[in-house]
Regions:
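An amphipathic, aromatic/His-enriched active-site/gating alpha helix that lines ligand/cofactor pockets
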Residues: 25-37, 56-93
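Short, well-ordered beta-strand segments in beta-rich or mixed alpha/beta enzyme
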Residues: 2-10, 38-71, 108
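Intrinsically disordered, low-complexity segments enriched in polar/charged residues with Gly/Pro
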Residues: 15-17, 27-29, 41-43
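Short, surface-exposed ligand-recognition loops at beta-strand->loop->(often short) alpha-helix junctions
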Residues: 10-22
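Non-catalytic surface loops within mature trypsin-like serine protease
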Residues: 11-13, 59, 95-98
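Glycine-rich beta-strand-turn "strand-cap" elements at beta-sheet edges
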Residues: 38-50, 76-110
């Protein structure tokens, strides 16, 4: 079973564009690590500084190792992500069937 990490957070005022760039750099680094299957970040369409960040890992072990690599490499550059947030993030970790989950993203020819 794969592990899906879902984070919903909001940024402080006037740093939302920078925060999204930093989130995207985190997700890009995650995608390059062994054990990360998918990673993306998105900003709310209603203009609010609300963000959705999701990462799919092969296992709990990969979640821990990839998260450690990302924080060690990127936090020294810009500080911890929490320093950009207006409050604590809502974080959920879900166990999903890897094949079924990834199949949802395959386009079917009609």
């Amino acid at each position: 079973m794969a592990w899906l990490e879902t984070v919903v957070c909001s940024s402080q005022k006037k740093v939302d564009a920078r925060f999204l760039r930093i989130l995207n750099s985190h997700q890009e680094l995650k995608r390059r690590q062994e054990g990360c299957l998918l990673a993306w970040a998105a900003k709310s369409v209603d203009g609010q500084p609300l963000f959705l960040v999701q990462t799919l890992y092969k296992s709990r072990k990969h979640l821990k190792s990839v998260s450690k690599i990302v924080s060690e490499k990127l936090d020294p550059e810009h500080g911890p992500l929490e320093s950009f947030m207006s409050g604590p993030p809502l974080v959920g970790i879900f166990e999903v069937d890897e094949v079924q989950f990834l199949d949802q993203f395959k386009s079917s020819e009609k």
